[in-house]
Regions:
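Extended alpha-solenoid helical-repeat scaffolds
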Residues: 1-277
Length: 277
């Protein structure tokens, strides 16, 4: 195990050297499928974490296909927190690329850009969830205990209802990486828009919300949510509130703050908290 780990770390160092990339392209093309299998299926968690960093370096040079990137992003739902944390930086890169594509050629305000960032995150999580559902179905229909889905590092077993939900796992893993996840107010602002109005009106080409003939505000397609995306953002919102309160409560216990007046409320921006909470 130790020898394999050292070999992976040496490979990681090689990909960090810009001068080596051109000479490594042939190796990458030949072995990247095997490297991805190691990231998703290896029995040694330390090896998996290191391989994920290798793949992150490979991806920075544009050497991974979209389906390969998507397969790696499923690890944000892995049952092992070390894997989820290890892949968080990779997921952030995929999200940033998606946001850039979504905003390309559009002149948007800062608020609109923030809404588009949330839309991008929701869209990715929905797509990854669907991919994981398909993987689970294949696993359930297979009698081969060594099928790839059974060996995918515990990702499939996250479906166990006794364990945390997928979105809760993603919130924990991406909390420090993707800004919208820790910004519950931003999530709430987008949820409060009437996304159903767009289905009843012709799509507006202008990159902003506009009023329809019926008087309802039509949400621009750049940040318009499907029902599945709304459900995901609601889960993100709930998870964000819980984590923010949990962290603040833990900090309060450490600091032994007095339980008096408004200072006793551990929640950030307590005065602006939604009334439903």
């Amino acid at each position: 195990m130790h020898v394999r780990l050292e070999a992976v770390r040496a490979l990681e160092d090689a990909y960090e050297q810009e001068d080596y990339i051109s000479s490594l392209q042939s190796f990458t093309s030949r072995f990247k499928t095997r490297i991805i299998q190691m990231a998703t299926s290896d029995v040694d968690v330390s090896v998996r974490v290191s391989v994920i960093q290798v793949l992150r370096s490979i991806d920075r040079h544009g050497l991974l296909e979209d389906d390969q990137r998507g397969k790696l992003c499923l690890l944000v739902f892995d049952e092992d927190p070390r894997i989820r944390k290890g892949v968080s930086g990779f997921v952030k890169g995929v999200w940033e690329d998606d946001v850039s594509e979504r905003l390309a050629g559009k002149k948007l305000s800062d608020v609109e850009k923030r809404q588009a960032e949330v839309k991008s995150l929701a869209s990715l999580l929905v797509n990854w969830g669907k991919a994981l559902d398909k993987l689970t179905i294949r696993e359930d229909s297979s009698e081969d205990e060594e099928s790839p889905s059974k060996r995918m590092g515990g990702v499939v077993s996250v479906m166990d209802p006794e364990k945390k939900g997928r979105t809760a796992l993603a919130v924990e893993a991406l909390w420090d990486e993707i800004d919208p996840i820790s910004d519950w107010e931003r999530l709430l602002d987008l949820l409060l828009l009437d996304h159903s109005a767009a289905a009843e009106e012709e799509e507006d080409e202008a990159p902003s919300s506009s009023s329809s003939p019926s008087g309802r505000t039509v949400v621009d397609a750049t940040w318009r949510l499907s029902e599945a995306e709304e459900a995901i953002i609601l889960e993100l919102f709930t998870g964000s509130i819980r984590k923010a309160v949990g962290e603040a409560t833990a900090a309060k216990k450490v600091c032994c703050l007095p339980d008096t007046g408004s200072a006793s409320d551990p929640t950030p921006s307590a005065g602006r908290r939604p009334s439903c909470f």
